[in-house]
UniProtKB/Swiss-Prot annotation:
TM annotation in the entry: 18-38
Name the UniProt record assigns to this protein: FAD-dependent monooxygenase sor5
Pathway noted in the entry: Secondary metabolite biosynthesis
Gene3D superfamilies, per the entry: FAD/NAD(P)-binding domain (3.50.50.60)
GO cellular component: membrane
Cofactor(s), by name: FAD
Top-rank taxon: Eukaryota
UniProt keywords, alphabetically: FAD, Flavoprotein, Glycoprotein, Membrane, Monooxygenase, Oxidoreductase, Transmembrane, Transmembrane helix
Pfam family, one: FAD_binding_3
Positions bearing carbohydrate: N43
Keyword Zinc: no
Length: 456
């Protein structure tokens, strides 16, 4: 869908209207929302706590629904991804028997084909399109309060403050905006350990070809088996294979910072909480019963590597994605496991719905009509209502997909089990991919018009 006649914001100059949006967090969701607002001529400032833009993690891929949302937000977002992505041979993500003989179980073909890229490469492309004056780095949010006029006042750890009409938390699984909305106590919504961990690394294509043959370097493959699975995705642009080794873990996540330091100190090294030092031997230990292909792939990982805890918000979800002048998008709203490949794409859908609602409110403000606390609050509630059911479904579904990938019976041990597993995964995949985000936007805008824009 095309944005609603807001193409005059592409030059990056501040729009001549009173609505100001604070985007807290400059990851993929925050940058995509920023470009969507820029295209729709809505004022915004990104407040990023780091000294530069970056993304945790290595590889990423976007499903067809996400690509449609990216194009509708701003075609440059989708193009930024396409420009740095590698297309898998045949356009398929193939799933094979990782326990026995590499037999093909099923394939998923997504839209124009499966492709993947490095997160940092996409971020680097997106940042090129955002004017520097719209960005504030080293801004670590401390609190959000209201001033006497009802506007939001953001206070940062360096003592500086900023005012905004809308605050959007795109600040990830440990969202400070979410804490400002719902608190940070034991009963507050938060990301929790999903009892899944991952070992991740990049392996030179030449090593993969020498060990397993050149045919393994051009295909995206998932090796499935009891208790774990391995994904190998080619990144041809850098001649590397991205390996992700996932292990289901019934134990609590033990990290060396939780409960041992004040919150401020814990926050200042998030990576220590979610990524612990580990070894290739630990990863190999979890896959001793898998076939030689899987064991050989894992043997190509570096001797020392990180062990990533996978967190999601299934067990402690946010009751809403909006409260007053604040709202959440992406992982801050609905962090999910990576098993269905839909988490980042859900952030793109969030950004599109939110950008269209904020553009409609900004147009109202430019016309001289009132856009105060009530109008903004109602608009953000409509955004939350538009996104909540689908995003929470994804969190649950992604957990379920991991259960299917790591079924206790090995693949090839009975056709009765294999068919429903592949069928359910395909059904869940199409529920993710076939979503009509344009219709969701139109429905949300219709509610906004009926409740806010045409009432006053």
């Amino acid at each position: 869908m095309e944005p609603n006649n807001h193409h005059d914001g592409l030059n990056g100059q501040k729009a001549d209207n009173p609505l100001e949006v604070a985007i807290v967090g400059g990851g993929l969701t925050g940058l995509a929302l920023a470009l969507g607002l820029l295209r729709r001529n809505v004022n915004f400032t990104i407040y990023e706590r780091a000294a530069s833009f970056g993304e945790l993690g290595v590889g990423i891929h976007f499903t067809p629904n996400a690509e449609r949302a990216m194009k509708a937000l701003d075609p440059r977002i989708l193009q930024s991804y396409v420009d740095v992505a590698t297309h898998a041979e045949g356009g398929f993500l193939s799933f094979v028997d990782g326990l026995h003989d590499d037999d093909l179980l099923f394939q998923l073909r997504m839209g124009e084909g499966y492709k993947a890229a490095r997160r940092c490469d996409i971020v680097s492309q997106l940042v090129k399109h955002i004017p520097q004056e719209r960005v504030q780095l080293l801004k670590w949010l401390q609190s959000v309060e209201e001033d006497a006029e009802g506007r939001a006042v953001l206070t940062f750890r360096d003592g500086s403050t900023a005012k905004a009409d809308v605050v959007v938390g795109c600040d990830g699984i440990r969202s400070q905006v979410r804490s400002a909305m719902f608190g940070s106590g034991p009963s507050a919504p938060r990301a929790q350990y999903a009892h899944q961990l991952a070992f991740r690394g990049l392996v030179p294509m030449a090593k993969v070809a020498a060990t397993l043959g050149p045919e393994k370097t051009s295909r995206a493959i998932g090796y499935l088996g009891p208790g774990g699975f391995v994904l190998s995705v080619p990144l041809a642009g850098i001649n590397m294979m991205h390996l992700e080794v996932f292990v289901m873990d019934p134990l609590p996540w033990s990290d060396d910072t939780t409960g041992s330091k004040p919150d401020k100190d814990k926050d200042e090294d998030d990576v220590k909480r979610y990524v612990l030092p580990s070894t290739r031997a630990e990863a190999e230990k979890a896959f001793t019963e898998f076939n030689p292909t899987v064991r050989s792939l894992i043997s190509l990982l570096p001797e020392e590597l990180g062990k990533w805890a996978i967190f999601d918000m299934l067990d402690s979800p946010a009751p809403s994605y909006a409260l007053g002048r604040m709202c959440l998008a992406g992982d801050a709203a609905h962090a999910s496991t990576p098993n269905q490949g839909g988490g980042a794409g859900a952030g793109m859908e969030d950004s599109l719905v939110l950008a269209e609602i904020l553009a409609a409110l900004a147009d109202r403000a430019k016309s001289g009509a009132r856009v105060g606390s009530w109008e903004i609050s109602e608009g953000l509630k409509i955004y939350s209502d538009a996104r909540y059911e689908r995003a929470q479904w994804l969190v649950q579904s992604s957990r379920r997909v991991a259960q299917l990938f790591t079924r206790k019976k090995g693949a090839g041990q009975g056709g009765e089990e294999e068919e429903p597993i592949s069928r359910e995964i395909l059904e869940r995949s199409h529920q993710l991919w076939d979503y009509d985000v344009d219709a969701a936007v139109e429905e949300a805008l219709g509610k906004l018009r009926a409740k806010v824009l045409e009432k006053h």
